[in-house]
Amino acid sequence: MLAALLGCVALLLVASVGAIALADRRLATTAIYGVALTASVAGLLLALAALLAPAPVPATLALPIGLPWLGAHFRLDALSAFFLVVANLGGAAASLYGLGYGRHEEAPARVLPFFPAFLAAMNLVLVADDAFSFLFSWEFMSLTSWALVMAHHRRSGNAAAGYLYLLMASFGTLALILAFGLLAGWSGAYDFAAIRTASPSALMGAAVLALALAGAGSKAGVVPLHVWLPLAHPAAPSHVSALMSGVMTKVAVYGFVRITFDLVGAPLWWWGALVALTGGITAVMGVLHALMEHDLKRLLAYHTVENIGIIFIGLGLALAFSANEMPAAAALALTAALFHVFNHSVFKSLLFFGAGAVLTATGERDMERLGGLIHRMPRTAFLFLVGSAAISALPPFNGFVSEWLTFQAILLSPALPQWLLKFLVPAIGALLALSAALAAACFVKAFGVTFLGRARSQVAREALETDRCSLGAMFTLAALCLVAGVLPAWFIDALAPVAQALTGSHLPERHGLDWLTIVPIAQSRSSYNGLLLFVLIAFAAALAAAAIHRFASDRVRRAPAWDCGFPDPSPATQYTAGSFSQPIRRVFGTVVFRAREEVEMPAPGATQSARLHVQLRDVLWDTLYVPAARAVALAADHLNAVQFLTIRAYLTLVFGALVALLAVLAIWQ
């Protein structure tokens, strides 16, 4: 099975090379996305088989490629199988979407060669079983995604977004190189099998955890390493944005889980506190920034930050429970985090596909220039509404279940022995609740301003529904949002081998009909029946519709409800995206955004319009990145003098560096 998965990867790489040779645009689009769809579906089926029917011993494969003394090692276990399901499901949906969306692509020659290579790179990361193969695949993933971000580099701001992403990706890779270097130095080998058998010291483990959090967190979008997401995601084509947000960030989560739960060994309790607190801050900061956005794709990018924070809350709780030898609670927290990995991959891809359909139909990402699209694009509007409900954690959709499971894990915090965790975990729960409420408010704004009301521009009035392939991909993901929310037990059962392997336990047996009800700990505490809730919601909706039909007047008359003296008010008088975010901006603006509002009022009696100017700044960008950039520029100016030294001075520098290196090696030994 592992060899077959690598065969799918090889097929994707062949398609990547073949895209360069195909000159006809339409043929190339159909062929490349068709091959990518075929390979992704095959990889999805193989990964599902490995996850649902796990082998007694994980499959391994060693190939004589890469470093001569190491080769390339690959491994397929329950953890990699689950993430392969996520990666190939997202790849299949993006490939199907690309069959239609790709026909409108402005620069297919800069997208088609790198799209299948990007899919192949993510698959390789998930099956790599040695440090060199992992890092090579990780960097391959970074470079192919960077090339896709730079596909439209001539547009304003896209080149800067691409270079910032490359900088953050390089920082993350450097951190992972150091992490694997420490693990390899301790174990004496680079393959993961040898690293697993060596138990690092507490200090070494803490250093590896910090480096893994920095390396994987920069790719996932953990605050304060999130700054590239709101720039790179809008710059990339929409189906690539869906892959980067829905899949690539999950590959980063996989890297963190693989290192901290599998390779490092037994955790310490404060590791969980650090990771969970980082997740809570990430969730709140992400959703606050999303609320301020008017750009639809930037808004979705910030919500990726929020949901990555939710995932890291679950991972942090799992580490804390594992350190305190509470395997059942650790399994619950880990299951919640991994289920949210799957859920976010599904509904975030759906939302980016919807944003791409709007962008294709109107050429606009600014919500202030949209509106009324539900009349022109009813199917896209309905599917975007499903994704909005799912990401807002509304039942009966999948986002509710994984966040509910996370809250159930938080409610177990009184059993933790450390007094700091007894206070910290409920505070993190409050941050999670705040982020969930703000997410719902944000998507009321996103859906309402984009699809409801009246069109605010001519392009919105003339928009047309998107193509069938794009709609097919969106309908598939929308159906998964509903199925995973109504029947979550099927998906939770599939995660049992992963939780068992990493925590030594899995969720307890559920009460009654296990395909109907999930019970995280005990029925007396809490349980959830998605199917029953769905039936009740459907019955209530049908009852309300019947009552309206029975008692409403049969006479239909279309007229303005009340024009308040204005015969035909402009669409500009509607509620705007800025109007929705103003209350939140005034509460958090000074601290989080350094917000400034300026009002230009015309003179008394003048007929000019008043103008409101709002300036928002990212505090983390101004506090961390701007000073760092200035320091680097200053250091570069001073080091510029090194270019003009004599040969004697250069030899002196080389000799000094050699002496310093030998001294470090002597101290290390």
Locations of regions flagged by a protein language model:
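Membrane-interfacial helical/loop segments at transmembrane boundaries in membrane proteins
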Residues: 59-68, 191-197, 405-418, 491-523
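Transmembrane helix-loop-helix hairpins at membrane boundaries of multipass inner-membrane proteins
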Residues: 1-7, 14-113, 186-199, 497, ...
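Membrane-interface helix-loop-helix modules in multi-pass inner-membrane proteins
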Residues: 58-84, 131-149, 216, 401
